[in-house]
C-alpha cells in the first residue's frame, strides 16, 4: 500500500485529533482507501476514520492489508514534516515497519515506525439515522467543553431542543454552568457524558470549521468532522448515567 497526502498538514491534523484519545491506531486498507477503527483504552470512545482513495494525491493498494502502530510514535514522525510538503506512507504485506517520507526542495526525509501486534477490535458503528443532528462551529464546541473542564465539571448534560444545543453541569465550589450553542430546532433530548471525554473529542475541531453533533436516545453520541474530498472522522462516545451526587442531575 502506498498513500500520498497532498500536504503533510492534512495528516498532521488527523493524527493530532487522535493523539489524546488513542494509544494505538489500526488501519485497514483496500483499493477504495484507508480506514482507522479503534477504541480508546477504557473502551468508552471509538474513532472511525475513513479516507477515500480520491482524496489522496496518489493511492495504490493491490490487496487488502491491516496494520497497527503506536499513536505516540506516529505523532513524533508526522510532526517533523513540513506542513506544505507531500507526505507518503508505505506498507508492505511482509514488512513489520511502516515507512513515511516527505521531501522539499532542500531535503528529503524518510522514517520507519515499528508495527505492533494486537487483537484489534472490530466493533460495528450505528447504521441508522440519528434523530438529532446539529451543525455547530467546531471552535465553539471546543471552547464550551474546555470551559466546563476548567470549571471542574465531571459530568455534562447535553440537551437538544428548540434553541439549539445546550451543555449543563455542576462544577467545583458550588458553580453551576449552562452553555447554549444556538442552532436549528431539534427534537428534545438529553444525555449525560463524562466531561473529560467530551473535551478530548472536541479537540478534533482543527479538522473542520463545523462539526455535526448527532444524538439519539438509543445510540452513542457522534461527532462528525468532514475532511472534504479526503473523507470524514466520526468520534463516538457512550452516554453516562450519573450517580447521585455527581455533577449533572
UniProtKB/Swiss-Prot annotation:
Gene Ontology annotations of biological process type: leading strand elongation; regulation of DNA replication
Official protein name in the record: Probable DNA polymerase sliding clamp
SUPFAM superfamilies given in the database record: DNA clamp
Keywords recorded for this protein, A-Z: DNA replication, DNA-binding, Early protein
Role according to the record: Sliding clamp subunit. Responsible for tethering the catalytic subunit of DNA polymerase to DNA during high-speed replication.
DNA-binding region: 60-79
Disulfide pairings: none
Higher taxonomy: Viruses, Viruses incertae sedis, Naldaviricetes, Lefavirales, Baculoviridae
NCBIfam families on file: pcna
Any Pfam family hit: PCNA_C
Family membership: Belongs to the PCNA family.
GO molecular function terms noted in the UniProt entry: DNA binding; DNA polymerase processivity factor activity
Highest taxon, organism lineage: Viruses
PROSITE patterns: PCNA_1 (PS01251), PCNA_2 (PS00293)
InterPro entries for the chain: DNA_clamp_sf (IPR046938), Pr_cel_nuc_antig (IPR000730), Pr_cel_nuc_antig_C (IPR022649), Pr_cel_nuc_antig_CS (IPR022659), Pr_cel_nuc_antig_N (IPR022648)
Amino acid at each position: 500500500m502506498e498513500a500520498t497526502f497532498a500536504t503533510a498538514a492534512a495528516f498532521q491534523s488527523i493524527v493530532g485529533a487522535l493523539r489524546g484519545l488513542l494509544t494505538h491506531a489500526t488501519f485497514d486498507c483496500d483499493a477504495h482507501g484507508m480506514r482507522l477503527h479503534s477504541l480508546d483504552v477504557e473502551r468508552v470512545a471509538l474513532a472511525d476514520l475513513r479516507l477515500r482513495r480520491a482524496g489522496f494525491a496518489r493511492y495504490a493498494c493491490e490487496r487488502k492489508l491491516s496494520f497497527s502502530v503506536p499513536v505516540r510514535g506516529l505523532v513524533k514522525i508526522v510532526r517533523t514534516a513540513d506542513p506544505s510538503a507531500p507526505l507518503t506512507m508505505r506498507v508492505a504485506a511482509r514488512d513489520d515497519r511502516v515507512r513515511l517520507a516527505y521531501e522539499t526542495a532542500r531535503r528529503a526525509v524518510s522514517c520507519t515506525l515499528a508495527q505492533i501486534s494486537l487483537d484489534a477490535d472490530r466493533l460495528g458503528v450505528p447504521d441508522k439515522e440519528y434523530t438529532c443532528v446539529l451543525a455547530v462551529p467546531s471552535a465553539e464546541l471546543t471552547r464550551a467543553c474546555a470551559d466546563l473542564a476548567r470549571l471542574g465539571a465531571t459530568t455534562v448534560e447535553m440537551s437538544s431542543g428548540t434553541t439549539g444545543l445546550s451543555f449543563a453541569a455542576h462544577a467545583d465550589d458550588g458553580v453551576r454552568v449552562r452553555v447554549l450553542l444556538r442552532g436549528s430546532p431539534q427534537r428534545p433530548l438529553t444525555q449525560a457524558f463524562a466531561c473529560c471525554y467530551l473535551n478530548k473529542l472536541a479537540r478534533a475541531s482543527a479538522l473542520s470549521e463545523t462539526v455535526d453533533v448527532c444524538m439519539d436516545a438509543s445510540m452513542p453520541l457522534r461527532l462528525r468532522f468532514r475532511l472534504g474530498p479526503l473523507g470524514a472522522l466520526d468520534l463516538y462516545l457512550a452516554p453516562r448515567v450519573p450517580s447521585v451526587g455527581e455533577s449533572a442531575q
